[in-house]
Amino acid sequence: MQAVRIGVTTATLAMLSTAAAAQAPGIAFGKNEYLRSCASCHGVSGKGDGPVAKSLSKPPTDLTRLADNNKGVFPVSRIYEVIDGRIQVTIHGTREMPVWGEVYTREVRTRAPRAMPDEMIDAMVRVRILGLIEYISTLQAK
């Protein structure tokens, strides 16, 4: 019975923490993540003109045109899958773009308490990726 109570308490805390984290990031969080993880290649404006762009085998994607290139619809799911590594973008050649989902997971695991459940770590990574996507959506050409 004690194990069931601990399991329910852990699950409840995880859900509450996930809900709080999901509300916390906002645009500022996503912008900071973008500047830290993406701007060196994609540029501050998202046009693919970052300081590292010229050293890549293929130019980075112009992130300001994602919706335009998808019939006016911002492709949230596809962007999520590119960031977390489920989709390899051919323009990146041999995957010059880091698999940020793996990078974020390693960072969270390094900082997280040893007993933190995998579900909580996954939720923290999801929040980080979603904050980044939310910010990228604000870069779309008008």
Protein language model regions, located:
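N-terminal secretory signal peptides that target proteins for export/translocation
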Residues: 1-4
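Bacterial N-terminal signal peptides
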Residues: 7-17
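Electrostatic cytochrome c docking/interface patches
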Residues: 16-34, 64-72
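Sequence context surrounding c-type heme c attachment/ligation sites in exported
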Residues: 27-39, 119-127, 141
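The canonical Cys-X-X-Cys-His
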Residues: 30, 34-44, 97, 132, ...
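Short, non-ligating residues that shape and space the ligands of small metal-coordination modules
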Residues: 47-48
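Short cysteine/histidine-rich zinc-coordinating motifs and their immediately flanking basic loops
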Residues: 51-55
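Extracytoplasmic electron-transfer domains, predominantly the class I c-type cytochrome c fold
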Residues: 56-119, 132-136
